[in-house]
Amino acid sequence: MELIESEKADKVFILDFLMEYQEFREKDVIVSSNIQDLESFCEQAWDASSKERKTLVVFDEIHNYGKKCPPIEILYRFGRHWNIEIIAASHRFADLPMITRSQTQQYYVFQVTEKCDLEFLRYSLSKEKVEQISNLADHKYVVLEF
């Protein structure tokens, strides 16, 4: 929650499997677990956005539904023009949708030990940085900027 609060968004949309659809009007937060209606969720976020106020969209476990998903791709490609910030969470780099990898500038990375993910990181990072990531302690992270 610290990361979300630091964004200081006027409206927050969270797609999370574990929660029921709720709207907290006093906090301007919409939480949905309905991945069957991604188009509606993304449209609500788009409609709430404007150049004058920040809209934050959070996709939890994006690897489960974000691959080749036109509504999510639209938010990634054009959202920055309408002050939309996106946070996407996933367990593994290799499972991130291509649109997420290509449009993300900052990653918060916890310990990575999976060989496939370490190989992915080696293409973009120094050997020392990959080593640091593979040896991170529990609940510690590094910020990567691309």
Could you say what each language-model-derived stretch is?
Residues 13, 85-87, 142:
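A structural signal for isolated positions on well-ordered beta-strands in alpha/beta enzyme cores
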Residues 10-11, 54, 139-141:
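Short, surface-exposed beta-edge/turn micro-motifs
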Residues 1-5, 18-21, 30-129:
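Conserved P-loop NTPase motor cores
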Residues 26-27:
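Exported/periplasmic cell-wall-interacting domains
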Residues 119-146:
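Phosphate-binding and hydrolysis-coupling loops of NTP-dependent motor/remodeling domains
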